[in-house]
Regions:
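An acidic, low-aromatic, low-complexity terminal/linker signal
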Residues: 1-153
Length: 153
């Protein structure tokens, strides 16, 4: 069972390091989000689409009385669609470089577990948002760098 993770208003100490990651299902991929960047895991929020938005931007939702951009995690990582999710979630997380980070929502098919990922086991990815792939138990997960989100475009 997942516990609620709330780092409060101070925000996380963002950066790449070995440690705990939240594993989430995004289409057919399992992705690892740095736990210290995760603020909350919620049942999927109601999303209001924005006309003309890119496919990755599902729209806006309300979180804490404020608008929250919701990104489609499966599209961001190029995952093939998976089965229809039984328990879709929105992961509220800090993204972007530390000096300009902002709160975003990531729409995912399921929150799976918290796991430790050794960065020495990460096989290089694109060097940006997808840090690389690493074995976690019996599966290979895509390790994500939320600091790089939004800097690649």
């Amino acid at each position: 069972m997942l516990r609620s993770v709330d780092h409060g208003g101070a925000g996380p100490r963002i950066g790449l390091s070995a440690g705990s990651y939240l594993l989430v299902q995004a289409g057919e991929y399992v992705c690892a989000l740095p736990l210290r960047s995760v603020r909350r895991v919620l049942r999927a929020l109601t999303v209001h689409p924005l006309p003309g938005a890119t496919a990755e931007l599902k729209g806006l939702a309300e979180f804490g009385g404020e608008p929250l951009p919701i990104l489609d995690l499966a599209r961001l990582v190029g995952a093939p669609p998976g089965a229809n999710p039984s328990y879709p979630v929105t992961i509220v997380a800090w993204a972007g470089p530390e000096e300009g980070r902002e709160l975003i929502g990531l729409a995912a098919d399921a929150a799976l577990e918290v796991a430790d990922v050794a960065l020495s086991s990460v096989v290089a990815g694109d060097g940006g948002f997808i840090l690389g792939e690493a074995p976690v138990g019996e599966q290979v997960v895509r390790v994500l760098n939320l600091e790089a989100l939004g800097q690649e475009r």
